[in-house]
Amino acid sequence: MRAAFLLVFVGLVACGDDGGGSVSLDDAPSVFRAEYCRYLTRCGVVPDEAECAGLNIGFGSHVDPSLRAAIDAGKIKFNSAILGRCYHQIGSISCDRTDESARQFGGIACYGAILGTVDTGGQCAVDTECLSKMCDVPACPDACCQGTCIGVAVAPPPYQIGVACQTTSDCESGAYCDSTTDVCTALKPAGATCTSTNECPYGMGCAGLTGTRTCKTLPVVGEACPDGQCRDAGTYCTAAKACAKVGLPGDACATNGDCSSFYVCDGTQHCAQGAHEGESCAVNARCADYGNFCDNATKICKGLQPDGATCTSSSQCESVFCTGTTGAMICQVEPICI
């Protein structure tokens, strides 16, 4: 089966109020970035939304041409109003990573933004085209291969305890998606062994330095963090084992770990943006500017590459499609598969 389309991380949003207007397919990437920057600013991960807009925060401006073609062909329904509501809510996600809103990404708030229309037995190229969200595509040498929708239509979330799931956002409040059984399971009690915060009661996280991890209350700024974890986004456990706010540009630091994940500790021992386009990224390997990447061969920050340029991954291309044999890959126009 081929992976389903992702509409600029349509699932990376929280359930909450119903604000936000309609968002068109063309505007989806920029709206998502703006809402994500609002969240990062509010939680102290970046200094302000204006700086965030120009930072390399991991999301581009590309809309999958195959998604657009599938919508035009009627294989996928696109609802701009639901997407608008969905994206608007990301800026309101709780900075408390143990809060329910910080865990229940997607689910009913985003269901229906993109929906497949092809029934079982129908022709498909990707999972998202199918009502079952399962497209069985045989192995073939071509860039686009046609398959068949299999399975039964997927019911809308949230799912009750005991029902099959793919992610925790599929499950009802008070439950998580067990990664071993793929079934919605009741949250564990305080003190129970765990592998992920998703398993713990709201307000608690899964923590422990070595051996068994358990569900417990996580520390906040100013409190000791013997397990090396802090509760809130925008905070970290220092070398002295105390929770503190992450460093932003100009703040003193000893290592990259003292700075927000979007910044580096420079040679003056202060948090900084990192290398800009045309500058060396040999030391920290982070390029600061939106759309830039660190070229492995030259160790220089480069902008997105045009069709015909050499590449090692699709994220380096303007087309977001890098193909070819190892050592001879180039950026090309992305094939449309529907």
Regions found by a protein language model. Give the residues of each.
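Sec-dependent signal peptide recognition
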Residues: M1-V8
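Short linear sequence motifs
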Residues: R2, L25, P29-F32, Q229, ...
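C-terminal motif of bacterial Sec signal peptides marking the signal peptidase cleavage site
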Residues: L12-A14
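Bacterial signal peptide processing site
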Residues: G16-D18
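Mature extracellular/luminal domains of secreted and GPI-anchored eukaryotic proteins, especially small
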Residues: G20-L131, P138-Y159
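Secreted, cysteine-rich disulfide-bonded mini-domains of extracellular proteins
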Residues: F105-I338
